[in-house]
């Protein structure tokens, strides 16, 4: 089977995370008799996968006509055209359904029927804060309503967790970008966890609903640790030393900080993730991370986890173990098996 994967050569961080598991498993694809290329040639392909950032310039310029023309050209070169994104679980580019056969998403709602409702702010948690606390965004928007046919095209892909989130990741990414030389992640050397929290998440968004969520966490954690942004070097040094790592929602539910926390063997403190379905499933409540409430986060809750912090050591270990197992491609074929299920689904 011949598969072409189209990405933006500027290698946006999400794009790099999209192709990373393919690159570390590249030789293993021979087991599936799959040939993968990243440049479209004159020949036709069984499947073409298009990363959403492939059209980033056209999306930014609102050049819908050029996007439509490209989709039509690509459709002539393949039996199956698949659009892929790693955006928030509810966000869907509804306008491209008419051009594609399948829509691959790195995270989807646990209940797909949610796609049939207009959600405030295009996220389940922004809908929650709007409805319960009447938080209003300056520029209000709602998620698109999808019909059953459109929902049937949505398939769970893979999130951006299988990638390099170490301190030197930006160097290795640029080596691949400019020299096409791929270097796999180095092992992390752990040091004593002599700091209680790392919570460097202070940031303002142009969405009141998102800011409301983050401010809830800011009020609690600013009493216990510094939350202002610091240099990359200082941040990673702090991460190595920290027992707990705090990662609230941002533009989406899944954040790079989640994977950095798993990699550096912290106990990930994160808002409850049970509302989404994602692969790999890093978010197993009270086993790989410690879920926190979307509201009613209070000092009593915090004092409980601080007082009993030794009870959570296993969560840090399990989160780290569960995260790293997807990188051992010589003994484990998790990504290969998941990729094969996707291929079987779209070709059945």
Which residues are covered by each model-predicted region?
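Nucleotide-sugar donor-binding catalytic core of glycosyltransferases
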Residues: 2-38, 42-256, 269-285, 330
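Catalytic binding pocket for nucleotide-activated donors in carbohydrate/polymer assembly enzymes
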Residues: 229-347
């Amino acid at each position: 089977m011949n598969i072409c994967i189209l990405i933006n050569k500027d290698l946006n961080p999400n794009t790099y995370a999209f192709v990373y598991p393919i690159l570390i498993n590249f030789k293993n694809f021979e087991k599936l008799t799959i040939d993968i290329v990243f440049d479209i040639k004159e020949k036709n392909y069984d499947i073409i996968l298009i990363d959403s950032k492939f059209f980033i310039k056209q999306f930014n310029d609102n050049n819908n006509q050029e996007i439509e023309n490209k989709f039509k050209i690509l459709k002539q070169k393949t039996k199956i055209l698949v659009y892929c994104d790693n955006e928030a679980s509810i966000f869907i580019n509804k306008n491209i359904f008419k051009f594609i056969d399948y829509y691959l998403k790195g995270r989807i709602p646990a209940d797909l029927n949610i796609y049939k409702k207009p959600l405030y702010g295009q996220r389940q948690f922004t809908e929650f804060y709007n409805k319960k606390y009447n938080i209003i965004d300056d520029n209000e928007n709602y998620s698109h309503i999808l019909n059953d046919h459109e929902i049937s095209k949505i398939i769970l892909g893979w999130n951006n967790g299988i990638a390099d989130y170490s301190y030197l990741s930006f160097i290795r990414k640029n080596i691949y970008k400019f020299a096409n030389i791929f270097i796999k992640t180095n092992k992390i050397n752990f040091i004593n966890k002599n700091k209680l929290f790392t919570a460097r998440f202070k940031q303002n968004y142009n969405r009141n609903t998102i800011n409301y969520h983050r401010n809830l966490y800011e009020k609690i954690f600013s009493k216990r640790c510094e939350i202002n942004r610091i240099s990359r070097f200082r941040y990673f040094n702090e991460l190595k030393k920290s027992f707990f790592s705090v990662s609230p929602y941002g533009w989406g539910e899944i954040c790079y900080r989640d994977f950095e926390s798993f990699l550096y063997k912290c106990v990930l403190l994160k808002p409850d993730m049970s509302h989404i379905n994602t692969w790999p499933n890093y978010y197993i409540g009270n086993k790989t991370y410690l879920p926190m409430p979307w509201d009613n986060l209070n000092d009593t809750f915090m004092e409980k986890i601080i007082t009993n912090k030794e009870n959570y050591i296993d969560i840090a270990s399990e989160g780290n173990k569960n995260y790293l197992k997807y990188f051992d491609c010589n003994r484990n074929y998790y990504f290969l098996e998941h990729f094969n299920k996707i291929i079987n689904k779209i070709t059945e």
